[in-house]
Structure formats: C-alpha cells, structure tokens
Amino acid sequence: MANAVTFTYKNVNYTLDFDRNTAVLLEQQGFSVENVYTKPNTYVPMIFYYAFAKYHKHIKRNLVDEIFEKMPKKMELIKALVDLYLETGNTLFDEPTGDEGNLTWEQNG
C-alpha cells in the first residue's frame, strides 16, 4: 500500500493523496498514466494539482504551481503520486470484509 506524501511549505502542512473520488476528478480531465511520460508538460502538473484535492480541495492553482517549482526530487514525487493514483483503481476489486449479508452472484447460461 502506498503512503500519502506529506510536506510543509511556509509553515503549512500538506498531504497529497488520492481516493476514488479524486481519481475520478483527475480522469475527467483526461488524465492517463501513460500521458505523464508522453506529455509531461500537461500531465505532470495535472497529477500534482489533483493530488491536493483529497485534503486541500480549495487550494489555489498558483500556490500549487509555486510549491511544485520549489519541490525537490520531482521524478520520485511524481512516481509516488502515480502509485497513489493507481492504488485507487485496485480498491475497486477488493473483496468485502466480514459478512455482507451473504451476498452472492452467479452467471446463468
């Protein structure tokens, strides 16, 4: 399981992470992982900006851009954000825990 990215900028603590809702917001903007590598000028800033949405949804874009400019180890950071994003899709296939009312399904045919 990937861990959220945390940092402090100008004495404010930030947490970058994704859940399925914020991943959907990112996808609705046309995001795909492949584009991070083929069209980085568009999609690297996009994934960085939307990583704020889970915990800091009202942050201004110009502040996010300022933070990104000063952020060290950008390649490692973007890889961590891609991993967090991909993990949200994996949760779609998690098996339920506990007794879910004995829900079962079958394919007829």
Kindly give the residue locations of the regions a language model identified:
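Charged interaction scaffolds used for protein-protein
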Residues: M1-T8, A23-V24, F31-T38, H58-G109
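Short, isolated positions in well-ordered beta-strands
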Residues: Y14-L16
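Residue-level signal for threonine
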Residues: D19
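Short, hydrophobic/amphipathic alpha-helical patches that form generic packing surfaces
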Residues: Y43-K54, K79-L86
